[in-house]
Amino acid sequence: MKKLLLLASVLAWVSGVFAEEKPKLIVGVVISHFYPEWMDMYANELSDNGLKRIMKQGARVNMNYNYFYTQTGVDHASIYTGMLPTEHGIVSRAWYDRLRRKRQYSTQSDRYTEIGDQQADSIKSLSPDYLQTMSLGSAMKWNNPMSRVFSIAMNGDEAVLSGGSSADMAIWFSEKTGKWVSSSYYRSELPEWLRMYNTWVESDHFVNKGWMMLSDEDKSAARIRLTNHFY
């Protein structure tokens, strides 16, 4: 599974599991198609307070999961529950429901509607109803009901399954509107701060900007080593 889970609070949470002071913030970041060796390869290009800090002060552990079929959503559910697809229930992005005789997507729900710029009862939304086990966010809520859990991603499946069943809110990017949306599973409307952000960020705000590399093309290409990869 070519994904890397980075915990920004790794110093407090991993290196000091039994520390007296509990961390007030845990940030989980999943980067799809990210090879761990790239962190060493591009170490000189990284900022001191970003990934390089995690490399120097964090902990690296083997988090391979014993399953072959990797997909968006399946992997995120495995990462944040610590379980295999056969255990957490998200075995694929979609499967055939024999009882209802229809194709069922892992997060698609007829019980909830989308909330956001095009909020309407006719727009069906997403929920973690098919997630069958406790996630990291749910465990935090169980340990401390005052904990707040938010999940944000470009893809709805990623946001919903990373947040888990007890998340305060999952937010994802709508390709139709170019704005951030959510589901009525969490609340009836978007929070004020997100509505203001959606007003400021138009869909062409980033589209009209060019992709500027931090280093020239030749320098970056020279650092990419494919000899140790399977392809």
Q: How should these model regions be labeled?
A:
Residues 84, 92-231:
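His/Asp/Glu-rich, glycine-adjacent segments
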